[in-house]
C-alpha cells in the first residue's frame, strides 16, 4: 500500500496518527500499512453494500450509483453506465499534501500547483473512482489528515492468466480468472483490443472486449475495460449470459459500436474518424516462460563456451527488449511485444509514409490526424501530457518514429524466434544460439585480430562524440550461415572495406538471425538520407551512436562487416533517391568532412581494407555530413565478420 510513498510522506502519515516514526523505510511502511488496514476495516464495516442488477455485475466492488449516473468527458467515461460517480468538491476540499499522496497512489504526476494536480486526477480514468461518494469502491487505504479522510484505492498485484489461446485481461477479478477462460469457437477467439488516439481532442485511449466461458462449460460473460492508455481505467462484467450465442452477440455488438466494423469482416478492417482501431494480435504461443531457471544457471549448465553464452543471454532477453521500447514511448502493455504481428508493423510504416508526404506542407490539421492514426496503430503511453506535444511534424521526429518501427520489426522476429520450442529446451541458451544461424568464435585479447579491431575502434572515435568512452567486453568472429555463398559474386570486387554498423541492443537477435535488411516498400524514403539501404561508417563512434546506450543500459553491440563497395556514387548532401544508382556504380557514399587517413589503413591477407587511420579533416569536402556514410542497396554485398560487445562510459557534465 504505502511502499510507493516517499519516506518523508510515510513518516508524516504516521505522525498524524500518533504512531512511532523511527526506523527504516520497510519498518515504517509495515507500521503504516497495519494502521491503514485497521482503518479500512472500520470503513468497510460502516459502508452500505451494492447490488448488481440484471446481467451487470460490479467488478472489484465498484458500485452502481443509481440516479447519479453521468457521462464523463475525456478518455475514461464514454460508457456512461454509472460505474463511478465523481465528487469534484471532495478533491477541492483536500489539502495540497493529501492531493499529492492521492496522485502518487493513482500513478498520476504530483508536481505543479493544486489546480494542476486536481485536473490530472479528474482526467485520470480511475482517479475519480478513488474519491467517490457512498461507500467502498473496493479495498481502500484511508489516510487521515485533520478533519478529512482521503480514500486511496488500494494497489493490488495483478497477473495475466492464460488458459487457451488468449490471455485473460489482467484486471479481471481473481475469482473469475480461476473459473473462466476466453471463449474460442474453432479458429474464432473472442478477444479484442482496441485503440484510439485523437490528437486534437487529447484522446489516447483503449477498449478491451472479451467473451468469458466457464471452465466447466455452460456459463458465459462479456468483459469490458476502457480508459486512457497507461492507467487501469474502468471495467464492467456483463452476465452470466443464458447462452453462448447471446454472449457472442453482445461482444460483436460492442465491437461494431466502437469500431464501425463487423467482427466477421475484421480482416478487412477500415479505420473511421472518432472510432477505435482494432489491434491485430498474434495468438501463437506467447507470454511463455522462455527461460528455465535463472540466467546464471543457464550459463553454468549450457554446452556453449561461457563468453558466447553470456552474449546470447544478453541479446535474447525479452525483458530487455520490452524495457528498451518502453524507454522510447512504446506501450508494451497494450500491445505486448510477443503479440506483435508483421501486418501491424507494416501499417505503422504506411502511416509514417503518409506523414512524410505532408510534413513539408505545414498542414497542421492533416498532421494531427495522421499522427493520431500512427499512435492508434503503434500504441504509445504519454501519461496525461497533452497530445499536441507529440505531433510528428518535423523530419527529426519522423526519423525517430521510423527507428522505433524498425526496432519493433526486429523484435517481432526475435519474439517468434525465442518462442519456438521445437529446439532442445534442456539447454535453452544453446537452442537460442542455433536459432541465430551464426557461428561465433571469441577472439583472445592477445591476438592480432583483436589488436587490429581495438586500434580501429580507438582511432576512429570522433572528437564530436566526446560524451562517452567505451570498453570492449568481448569480440567474436562471426559467420552467418549462407552469407559467404551469397557474397561470393562480390568476393573479388575491388574496394572491399571493413566497416561499422551499430543498432539498438533490442535489435540484435533479429539482425543476427535474419541478416542486415533494407526497409520495406511501406517505409517513407524521406526517413533515409541516401535512400533505403544498409548504412555503414568508417568512424566507430558514428555507428556507436546508433546503439542508443544509456546510463540505465550501458551495453552496446556493433558489427564489423566486409562490404563490397566497387565504384562509388559520391554525394555531399542528402538524396532520397540515391538508391537509383548511375550506371556502373555499386553503392553510394555520403562524403563527410572528417575521415580516417587512408594512408594509415591496413590491408588484410584477403584484400579487405581496414580504415583504422587517425581521422583527418578533408577541407575540400564541405557537404552536410561530418563523417562518411556508406550505403549499399543489395544485401548480397555484405558479409558479417566480427561482432563487438562494448560497455559505454558516459562522462558527467
UniProtKB/Swiss-Prot annotation:
Gene for this chain: PARP2
Keywords: ADP-ribosylation, DNA-binding, Glycosyltransferase, NAD, Nucleotidyltransferase, Nucleus, Repeat, Transferase
Domain SAP: 2-36, 91-125
Official protein name in the record: Poly [ADP-ribose] polymerase 2
Protein source organism: Zea mays
Residue ranges of every copy of the WGR domain listed in the record: 179-276
Molecular function terms from GO: DNA binding; NAD+ poly-ADP-ribosyltransferase activity; NAD+-protein-aspartate ADP-ribosyltransferase activity; NAD+-protein-glutamate ADP-ribosyltransferase activity; nucleotidyltransferase activity
One Gene Ontology biological process: double-strand break repair
Motif Nuclear localization signal, residue numbers: 69-72
A Pfam family that the UniProt record links to this protein: WGR
Reactions catalysed: NAD(+) + (ADP-D-ribosyl)n-acceptor = nicotinamide + (ADP-D-ribosyl)n+1-acceptor + H(+); L-aspartyl-[protein] + NAD(+) = 4-O-(ADP-D-ribosyl)-L-aspartyl-[protein] + nicotinamide; L-glutamyl-[protein] + NAD(+) = 5-O-(ADP-D-ribosyl)-L-glutamyl-[protein] + nicotinamide
UniProt domain PARP catalytic: residue ranges: 427-653
UniProt-listed Enzyme Commission number(s): 2.4.2.30, 2.4.2.-
Similarity comment: Belongs to the ARTD/PARP family.
A Gene Ontology cellular-component term: nucleolus
Functional summary from the UniProt entry: Involved in the base excision repair (BER) pathway, by catalyzing the poly(ADP-ribosyl)ation of a limited number of acceptor proteins involved in chromatin architecture and in DNA metabolism. This modification follows DNA damages and appears as an obligatory step in a detection/signaling pathway leading to the reparation of DNA strand breaks.
Every PARP alpha-helical domain range: 301-419
Localization terms from the record: Nucleus
Gene3D superfamilies noted in UniProt: 3.90.228.10, Poly(ADP-ribose) polymerase, regulatory domain, SAP domain, WGR domain
Region described as Disordered: 64-84
Broad EC category: transferase
Record bears the keyword Nucleus: yes
Amino acid at each position: 500500500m504505502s511502499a510507493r510513498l516517499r519516506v518523508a510522506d510515510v513518516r508524516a502519515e504516521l505522525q498524524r496518527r500518533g504512531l512511532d516514526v523511527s526506523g527504516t523505510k520497510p519498518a515504517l511502511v509495515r507500521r503504516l500499512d497495519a494502521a491503514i488496514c485497521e482503518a479500512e476495516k472500520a470503513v468497510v464495516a460502516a459502508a452500505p453494500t451494492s447490488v448488481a442488477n440484471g446481467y451487470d455485475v460490479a467488478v472489484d466492488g465498484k458500485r452502481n450509483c443509481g440516479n447519479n449516473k453521468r457521462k464523463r468527458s475525456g478518455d475514461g467515461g464514454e460508457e456512461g453506465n454509472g460505474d463511478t460517480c465523481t465528487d469534484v468538491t471532495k478533491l477541492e476540499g483536500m489539502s495540497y499534501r493529501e492531493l499529492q499522496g492521492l496522485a502518487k497512489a493513482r500513478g498520476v504526476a504530483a508536481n505543479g500547483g493544486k489546480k494542476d494536480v486536481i485536473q490530472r486526477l479528474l482526467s485520470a480514468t480511475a482517479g475519480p473512482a478513488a474519491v467517490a461518494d457512498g461507500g467502498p469502491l473496493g479495498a481502500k487505504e484511508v489516510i487521515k489528515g485533520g478533519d478529512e479522510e482521503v480514500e486511496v484505492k488500494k494497489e493490488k498485484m495483478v497477473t495475466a492468466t492464460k488458459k487457451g489461446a488468449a490471455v485473460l485481461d489482467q484486471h479481471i477479478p481473481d475469482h473469475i480468472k480461476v473459473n473462466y477462460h476466453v471463449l474460442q469457437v474453432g479458429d474464432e477467439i473472442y478477444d479484442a483490443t482496441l485503440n484510439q488516439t485523437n490528437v486534437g481532442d487529447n484522446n489516447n485511449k483503449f477498449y478491451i472486449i472479451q467473451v468469458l466461458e466457464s471452465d466447466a462449460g455452460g456459463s458465459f460473460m462479456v468483459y469490458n475495460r476502457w480508459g486512457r492508455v497507461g492507467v487501469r481505467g474502468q471495467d464492467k462484467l456483463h452476465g452470466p449470459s443464458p447462452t453462448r450465442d447471446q454472449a457472442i452477440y453482445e461482444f460483436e455488438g460492442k465491437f461494431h459500436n466502437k469500431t464501425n466494423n463487423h467482427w466477421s469482416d475484421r480482416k478487412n478492417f477500415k479505420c473511421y474518424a472518432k472510432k477505435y482501431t482494432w489491434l491485430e494480435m498474434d495468438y501463437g504461443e506467447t507470454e511463455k516462460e522462455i527461460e528455465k531457471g535463472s540466467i546464471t544457471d543457464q550459463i553454468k549448465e549450457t554446452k556453449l563456451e561461457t563468453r558466447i553464452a553470456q552474449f546470447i543471454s544478453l541479446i535474447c532477453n525479452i525483458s530487455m527488449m520490452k524495457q528498451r521500447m518502453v524507454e522510447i514511448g512504446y506501450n508494451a502493455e497494450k500491445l505486448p511485444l510477443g503479440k506483435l504481428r508483421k501486418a501491424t508493423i507494416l501499417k505503422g510504416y504506411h502511416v509514417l509514409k503518409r506523414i512524410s508526404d505532408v510534413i513539408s506542407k505545414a498542414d497542421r490539421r492533416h498532421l494531427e490526424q495522421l499522427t493520431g492514426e500512427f499512435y492508434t496503430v503503434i500504441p504509445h503511453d504519454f501519461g496525461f501530457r497533452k497530445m499536441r506535444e507529440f505531433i510528428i511534424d518535423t523530419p527529426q521526429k519522423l526519423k525517430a518514429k521510423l527507428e522505433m518501427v524498425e526496432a519493433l520489426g526486429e523484435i517481432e522476429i526475435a519474439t517468434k524466434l525465442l518462442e519456438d520450442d521445437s529446439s532442445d529446451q534442456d539447454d535453452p541458451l544453446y537452442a537460442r544460439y542455433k536459432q541465430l544461424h551464426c557461428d561465433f568464435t571469441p577472439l583472445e585479447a592477445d591476438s592480432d585480430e583483436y589488436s587490429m579491431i581495438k586500434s580501429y575502434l580507438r582511432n576512429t572515435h570522433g572528437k564530436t562524440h566526446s560524451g562517452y568512452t567505451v570498453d570492449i567486453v568481448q569480440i567474436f568472429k562471426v559467420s552467418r550461415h549462407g552469407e559467404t555463398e551469397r557474397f561470393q559474386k562480390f568476393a573479388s570486387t575491388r574496394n572491399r572495406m571493413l566497416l561499422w554498423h551499430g543498432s539498438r541492443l533490442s535489435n540484435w537477435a533479429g539482425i543476427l538471425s535474419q541478416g542486415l535488411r533494407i526497409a520495406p516498400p511501406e517505409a517513407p524514403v524521406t526517413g533515409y538520407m541516401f535512400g533505403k539501404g544498409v548504412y555503414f561508417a568508417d568512424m566507430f563512434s558514428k555507428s556507436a551512436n546508433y546503439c542508443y546506450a544509456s546510463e540505465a543500459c550501458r551495453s552496446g553491440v556493433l558489427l564489423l562487416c566486409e562490404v563490397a563497395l566497387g565504384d562509388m556514387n559520391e554525394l555531399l548532401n542528402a538524396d532520397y533517391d540515391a538508391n537509383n544508382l548511375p550506371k556502373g556504380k555499386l553503392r553510394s557514399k555520403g562524403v563527410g568532412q572528417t575521415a580516417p587517413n587512408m594512408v594509415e589503413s591496413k590491408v588484410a591477407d584477403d584484400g579487405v581494407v581496414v580504415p583504422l587511420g587517425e581521422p583527418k579533416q578533408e577541407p575540400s569536402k564541405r557537404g552536410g555530413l561530418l563523417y562518411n556514410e556508406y550505403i549499399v542497396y543489395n544485401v548480397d554485398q555484405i558479409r558479417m565478420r566480427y561482432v563487438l560487445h562494448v560497455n559505454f562510459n558516459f562522462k558527467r557534465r
